[in-house]
């Protein structure tokens, strides 16, 4: 069950971003930290680099939007960033852009046990994620993949 505050924050952030030619890649809300933390990752449409100025401008806009919405009635920390190394691959474009890059895949096997594999991203088709592990291609059914994350070349 989704938190209604998170849902509302995602809508506010997405609408605010769209008005500036940006899109929200990810939004995390941590109500248990003091102060509350809201982390928003943005990128330009189509995927272009986001500058520090873009993050600062978006931070100002979304902060004002959150204040006006009265969703959060206590102090909060707002963190705006852009995707970078170590981030999750999610879109088809991500998988095309980072072909050949080192990744770590978290997936479940037939017994529903979570496993990881590390290698180079080879391809993502409609049915499989293919990774190159020491020169051998390993196929993981897409429905079993939980996350795919960029890693450093050393692992």
Curated annotation (Swiss-Prot):
Name the keywords, alphabetized: Cytoplasm, Ribosome biogenesis
Q: One GO cellular component term, please give it.
A: cytosol
Q: What is its main location?
A: cytoplasm
- Per UniProt, what is one Pfam family of this protein? RimP_N
GO biological process assignments: ribosomal small subunit assembly; translation
Its annotated compartments are:
Cytoplasm
Q: Which domain of life is it from?
A: Bacteria
Q: Which family does it belong to?
A: Belongs to the RimP family.
Q: What does this protein do?
A: Required for maturation of 30S ribosomal subunits.
The protein here is known as Ribosome maturation factor RimP
| Organism encoding this protein | Prochlorococcus marinus (strain MIT 9211)
Q: Which gene encodes it?
A: rimP
């Amino acid at each position: 069950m989704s938190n209604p505050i998170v849902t509302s924050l995602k809508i506010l952030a997405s609408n605010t971003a769209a008005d500036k030619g940006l899109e929200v890649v990810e939004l995390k809300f941590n109500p248990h930290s003091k102060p509350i933390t809201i982390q928003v990752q943005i990128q330009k449409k189509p995927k272009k680099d986001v500058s520090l100025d873009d993050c600062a401008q978006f931070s100002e806009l979304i902060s004002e939007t959150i204040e006006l919405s009265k969703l959060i009635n206590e102090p909060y920390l707002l963190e705006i960033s852009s995707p970078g190394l170590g981030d999750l691959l999610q879109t088809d474009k991500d998988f095309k852009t980072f072909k050949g890059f080192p990744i770590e895949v978290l997936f479940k096997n037939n017994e529903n046990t979570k496993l990881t594999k590390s290698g180079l991203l080879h391809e993502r088709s409609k049915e499989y994620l293919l990774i190159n592990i020491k020169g051998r291609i390993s196929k993981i059914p897409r429905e079993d993949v939980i996350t795919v994350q960029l890693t450093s070349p050393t692992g």
